[in-house]
């Protein structure tokens, strides 16, 4: 069997080498010719799996090691009779930890604020519910908005109420353009007008959920602290926008070693189900041991002392800013940052909590 895999997928050889010949390719530039005689295709979100890519191929299975599916033309896949799978929730823990790390980097005193600090979570799926749990471990008040999901553990509110009451808003919705609850440009001029000027905004979901022109106008008016891991016009980022952001990272909020490995394992399991193979591999066997920071210690004390060692978010903010040339970060530089990003470990690897 020929298997074509994105060259940046983690542990592909460990999970798939026994099944056939793996060809590693650059995901963003994958062509019909690359996949024509392949039976399985393994991708990330940078590959648009559409009709022109998959028609008249030998493909029987497409696995995407990602939470989202907006890069997959599911209708075209099903029309061609190709089984598909994604890895919903694979890096949800990593994204939740990214958000808390970003907030504590911007304001370390949040560790002491308990319920005086209100975190508003937009989207209560795999990431949102984990973030809610982790935030509550720190004593924060959590409110959430999701038209499809209600969490018993938090206060569920309307979108408008969340915007008005939250001290920080974190976005965790898929990108949708149709229907009553479409998320494209959910954060537009009207949404920004409802936010308090000192409310922190974090987007680690999908870039176009935030209307960039409205965001720029809002920051100019309010000096709002904004953290972006995703961008409306990604992978190109303007220097003007970058200079306005409190923190910027190149779409790596979910890039933990555990998250990457978990994503590949999930599409491996779906692959095995499709082709009738036994599922007998676990990503945990491939991960090196880490220094234990948390066991037997107070959570907040450890975060105060060790957070930058667990994940030095400021370094990766500096890295993306260093890539600016002629007024912008180009696609090639953006992709290189992602490819060369050293995968951090989740808190649980250091003996810490996990949602």
Curated annotation (Swiss-Prot):
Q: Name one GO biological process term.
A: pyridoxine biosynthetic process
Q: What is its main location?
A: cytoplasm
Q: What class of enzyme is it?
A: oxidoreductase
Q: Which cellular compartments is it found in? A: Cytoplasm
Spell out the Gene3D superfamilies in the cross-references: 3.30.1370.170, NAD(P)-binding Rossmann-like Domain
GO-annotated cellular components: cytoplasm
Q: Quick one: which pathway? A: Cofactor biosynthesis; pyridoxine 5'-phosphate biosynthesis; pyridoxine 5'-phosphate from D-erythrose 4-phosphate: step 2/5
* Chain residues that bind substrate: 45, 66, 255
What superkingdom heads the lineage? Answer: Bacteria
Keyword line: Cytoplasm, NAD, Oxidoreductase, Pyridoxine biosynthesis
Q: Name one Pfam family in it.
A: DUF3410
Residue positions annotated to bind NAD(+) are 146, 229, 254
Function, in words:
Catalyzes the oxidation of erythronate-4-phosphate to 3-hydroxy-2-oxo-4-phosphonooxybutanoate.
Family classification: Belongs to the D-isomer specific 2-hydroxyacid dehydrogenase family. PdxB subfamily.
Q: How is this protein named in the record?
A: Erythronate-4-phosphate dehydrogenase
Q: What organism does this protein naturally occur in?
A: Acinetobacter baumannii (strain SDF)
Ranked from the top, the taxonomy reads:
Bacteria, Pseudomonadati, Pseudomonadota, Gammaproteobacteria, Moraxellales
């Amino acid at each position: 069997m020929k298997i074509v895999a994105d060259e940046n997928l983690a542990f592909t050889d460990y999970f798939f080498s026994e099944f056939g010949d793996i060809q590693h390719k650059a995901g963003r530039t994958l062509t019909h010719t690359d996949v024509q005689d392949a039976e399985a295709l393994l991708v990330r979100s940078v590959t648009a799996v559409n009709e022109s890519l998959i028609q008249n191929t030998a493909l029987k299975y497409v696995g995407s090691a990602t939470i989202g599916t907006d890069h997959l033309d599911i209708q075209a896949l099903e029309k061609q009779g190709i089984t598909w799978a994604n890895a919903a929730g694979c890096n949800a823990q990593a994204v939740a930890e990214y958000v808390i790390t970003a907030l504590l980097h911007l304001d370390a005193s949040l560790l002491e604020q308990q319920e005086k600090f209100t975190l508003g979570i937009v989207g209560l799926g795999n990431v949102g519910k984990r973030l809610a749990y982790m935030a509550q471990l720190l004593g924060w008040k959590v409110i959430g908005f999701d038209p499809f999901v209600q969490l018993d553990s938090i206060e569920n509110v309307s979108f408008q109420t969340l915007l008005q009451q939250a001290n920080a808003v974190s976005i965790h919705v898929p990108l949708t353009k149709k229907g009553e609850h479409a998320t494209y440009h959910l954060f537009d001029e009207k949404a920004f007008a409802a936010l308090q000027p000192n409310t922190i905004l974090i987007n680690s979901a999908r870039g176009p959920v935030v209307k960039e022109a409205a965001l720029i106008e809002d920051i100019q008016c309010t000096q709002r602290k904004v953290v972006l891991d995703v961008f409306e016009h990604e992978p190109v980022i303007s220097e003007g926008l970058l200079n306005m952001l409190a923190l910027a990272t190149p779409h790596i909020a979910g890039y933990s070693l555990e998250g990457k490995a978990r994503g590949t394992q999930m599409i491996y399991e779906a692959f095995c189900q499709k082709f009738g193979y036994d599922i007998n591999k676990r990503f945990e066997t491939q991960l090196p041991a880490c220094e234990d920071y948390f066991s037997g210690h107070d959570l907040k004390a450890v975060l105060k002392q060790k957070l930058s060692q667990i994940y030095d978010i400021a370094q990766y903010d500096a890295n993306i800013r260093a890539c600016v040339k002629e007024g912008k970060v180009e696609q090639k530089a953006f992709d290189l940052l992602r490819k060369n990003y050293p995968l951090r470990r989740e808190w649980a690897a250091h003996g810490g909590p996990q949602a």
